[in-house]
């Protein structure tokens, strides 16, 4: 997992819960990296699971709720670091329909070893998009946060419904309606 995912996660934890909580979850997680991340490094997914689990235990907030908030936060990091890519899209539905065919292609150019989820567009109109999310990491709430924030970025509102196609969350159907 790319380091930017870790650095932004710890930034979010610090901004929402304080530096002491960051240190607490790092200490509790017994990380191979010792909690030292660079945005361009690559780290084990198990470290993120451990950090997330310990944050959930400390805050008493469900992991999926934390992941969704993190997705909302991470979109801002994408705007800051890769805003030029987002400017090529007129709106969130166009952006979301281009994840697999354009955005992930660009990510792979920058980070050839990145392990990205797959997004399949099943249906797309001016006001609706239906996507299938696939990832062995089952981070669909994170993806939902990113989707939600993409609408906000373009000054639009949306309603997102999801259906687990696999119980472990590795395959999820998202239906997103522009409001």
Model-derived segments and spans:
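Short terminal or interdomain "cap/linker" segment that borders an active site or interface and mediates
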Residues: 4, 113-139, 156-179
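A general alpha-helix detector
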Residues: 4-12, 50-54
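Short cationic amphipathic helices and targeting signals
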Residues: 11, 130-133, 147
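Short basic helix-loop element that most often maps to the first helix and adjoining turn
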Residues: 12-19
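Long amphipathic alpha-helical segments
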Residues: 20-58
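Amphipathic interaction/junction segments at domain boundaries or subunit interfaces
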Residues: 48-141
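Short, non-transmembrane amphipathic alpha-helical segments
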Residues: 141-155
